[in-house]
């Protein structure tokens, strides 16, 4: 059976056009950091039994007070902000005078590629943050009583200069005139980071459950 070449070309063009019109659109993933995400999986417990975990990660847009320069730095590092299993509102982005009284300083936990880092941003130097601690997202996990799924147990908070002066364990800090950073593993340990003349002191302050 012979067919006119022009007819064949027309039929092929019609098939290609129909395919182009009916093909489903390619899926589009949301831009990085624009939506809340869950990091989940299983880890081995102390007795070797697998335990499930689920860590909530909030986008930077959940923290509208963050200065744009800091948002840019965190975005470059592909950061999302991990939330503790106790969180009732966005947390783990804090503000205070961490190197001088009244300074416009910030600190944030940044989760990226399975690792969380505690960054501090000093006023006037937002483009050169300091990393105080970095560890796997799953290093510190915990849960509320009665819950079987673990969540992040890493939380940070601002400790004011007045709170520092009221605590006897900070006596070796010679001059307390500005804020510090509480760096806690919930219900277990608490480290207080204090910038003393450009050097960060890490002071163990006992169990977080005592504060």
Predicted regions and their residues:
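Bacterial N-terminal signal peptides that target proteins for export
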Residues: 1-11
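Bacterial N-terminal signal peptides
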Residues: 9-19
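Acidic, small-residue rich beta-repeat scaffolds with periodic aromatic anchors
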Residues: 20-61, 137-211
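Short, non-transmembrane alpha-helical segments in secretory-pathway proteins
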Residues: 58-87
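Acidic, divalent-cation-chelating loop motifs in proteins
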Residues: 93-101
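Acidic/hydrophobic-patterned starts of short beta strands in beta-sheet-rich repeat architectures
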Residues: 100-110, 173, 177-181
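Structural motif
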Residues: 114-120, 190-192
């Amino acid at each position: 059976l012979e067919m006119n070449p022009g007819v064949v070309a027309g039929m092929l063009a019609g098939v290609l056009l129909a395919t182009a019109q009916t093909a489903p659109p390619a899926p589009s993933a949301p831009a990085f950091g624009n939506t809340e995400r869950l990091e989940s999986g299983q880890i081995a417990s102390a007795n070797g039994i697998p335990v499930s975990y689920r860590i909530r990660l909030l986008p930077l847009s959940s923290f509208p007070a963050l200065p744009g320069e800091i948002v840019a730095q965190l975005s470059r590092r592909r950061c999302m902000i991990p939330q503790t299993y106790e969180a009732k509102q966005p947390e783990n982005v804090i503000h205070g005078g961490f190197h001088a009284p009244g300074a416009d300083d910030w600190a944030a936990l940044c989760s990226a590629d399975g690792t969380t880092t505690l960054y501090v941003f000093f006023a006037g130097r937002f483009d050169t943050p300091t990393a105080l601690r970095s560890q796997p997202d799953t290093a510190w996990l915990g849960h509320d009583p009665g819950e079987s799924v673990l969540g992040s147990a890493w939380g940070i908070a601002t400790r004011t200069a007045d709170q520092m002066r009221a605590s006897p364990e900070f006596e070796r800090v010679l001059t307390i005139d500005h804020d510090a950073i509480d760096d806690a593993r919930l219900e277990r340990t608490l480290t207080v980071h204090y910038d003393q003349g450009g050097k960060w002191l890490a002071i163990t302050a006992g169990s977080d459950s005592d504060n």
